[in-house]
């Protein structure tokens, strides 16, 4: 039940079926990529250098909170390198044969994108090591005493991996990535540009203050910004003339219970529980999760990152602690 509530949450940064239209408005090239200036500049250099040498780009690990554009960046890398993108995820690769099938279907210059790579099984990791280092695939033929190992040569390819939990990657896997990029929460100016661009592509008339209002409440996350834009568009059609300004955007988001800080009922409930049941902390994440009837992963991946980044909560060795700012503003 808690999982369903989280999935229905408007400002849930995890991707859902409702986000499918976003594929039509995602940037396709680095020149169109908004925000993350350090990552963008570095990737421009790395990609241009690899193309000039006619080599595959080094294997790339992208990590950071959900909804910041890891999949979008993987698509851009494939397009910029002129290869095809083959996508999968850690939980999907259950058997060695699953990964072997994907690797043997790659062509030179292709990009293999593995989302949630921290969820790979050890067996799959072992197959990846020689594939990443030497472009070789070791497979077993036969069973029992007659079984033998053979090596298959793979074309040069780039593994692009994404994770929200870089700390869960094993050292041998992490060390095999030549490029490691961390995506940060977006500032309001960059999110405003993203919202304005999306509205233009969706052919929704919108003023600058309308874009700013949506960006302010989007929790530093483009996926949430695009989702809020679609709901504000609905409100503008029904309660207005179809165009979005600051007042319309504010009224729509107030109706949707997303406040000016980008917080909703689950954020406020988290803070209330930490304040009332645990006297502001420190409190262990398992205890807070149990009190909210959520799982630990949901708190760590979905609720806490933005609260911590905004300075409402501290993550200490002894547990979670409310800051004075959270108490002053929300309790």
Swiss-Prot record:
Binding site for Mg(2+): 71
Top EC class for this record: hydrolase
Gene Ontology CC terms, in alphabetical order: cytoplasm; Holliday junction resolvase complex
NCBIfam families linked: PRK00080.1, ruvB
Keyword Repeat carried by entry: no
HAMAP family given in the database record: DNA_HJ_migration_RuvB
Function according to Swiss-Prot or TrEMBL: The RuvA-RuvB-RuvC complex processes Holliday junction (HJ) DNA during genetic recombination and DNA repair, while the RuvA-RuvB complex plays an important role in the rescue of blocked DNA replication forks via replication fork reversal (RFR). RuvA specifically binds to HJ cruciform DNA, conferring on it an open structure. The RuvB hexamer acts as an ATP-dependent pump, pulling dsDNA into and through the RuvAB complex. RuvB forms 2 homohexamers on either side of HJ DNA bound by 1 or 2 RuvA tetramers; 4 subunits per hexamer contact DNA at a time.
Keywords carried by this UniProt record: ATP-binding, Cytoplasm, DNA damage, DNA recombination, DNA repair, DNA-binding, Hydrolase, Nucleotide-binding
Subunit organization: Homohexamer. Forms an RuvA(8)-RuvB(12)-Holliday junction (HJ) complex. HJ DNA is sandwiched between 2 RuvA tetramers; dsDNA enters through RuvA and exits via RuvB. An RuvB hexamer assembles on each DNA strand where it exits the tetramer. Each RuvB hexamer is contacted by two RuvA subunits (via domain III) on 2 adjacent RuvB subunits; this complex drives branch migration. In the full resolvosome a probable DNA-RuvA(4)-RuvB(12)-RuvC(2) complex forms which resolves the HJ.
Catalytic activity: ATP + H2O = ADP + phosphate + H(+)
Family as reported in the entry's similarity comment: Belongs to the RuvB family.
Alphabetized Pfam families for the sequence: AAA_lid_4, RuvB_C, RuvB_N
Cross-referenced SMART domains: AAA
InterPro entries registered for this protein in UniProt: AAA+_ATPase, AAA_lid_4, DNA_helicase_Holl-junc_RuvB, P-loop_NTPase, RuvB-like_N, RuvB_C, WH-like_DNA-bd_sf, WH_DNA-bd_sf
Name of this chain's protein: Holliday junction branch migration complex subunit RuvB
UniProt: ATP binding residues: 25-26, 67, 70-72, 133-135, 176, 186, 223
UniProt comment concerning the protein's domains: Has 3 domains, the large (RuvB-L) and small ATPase (RuvB-S) domains and the C-terminal head (RuvB-H) domain. The head domain binds DNA, while the ATPase domains jointly bind ATP, ADP or are empty depending on the state of the subunit in the translocation cycle. During a single DNA translocation step the structure of each domain remains the same, but their relative positions change.
Residue numbers spanned by region Large ATPase domain (RuvB-L): 1-186
GO molecular function: ATP binding; ATP hydrolysis activity; four-way junction DNA binding; four-way junction helicase activity
Annotated region (Small ATPAse domain (RuvB-S)), positions in chain: 187-257
Main location class: cytoplasm
Protein's GO biological process: DNA recombination; DNA repair
EC number(s) on file: 3.6.4.-
Compartment list: Cytoplasm
Residues that bind DNA: 296, 315, 320
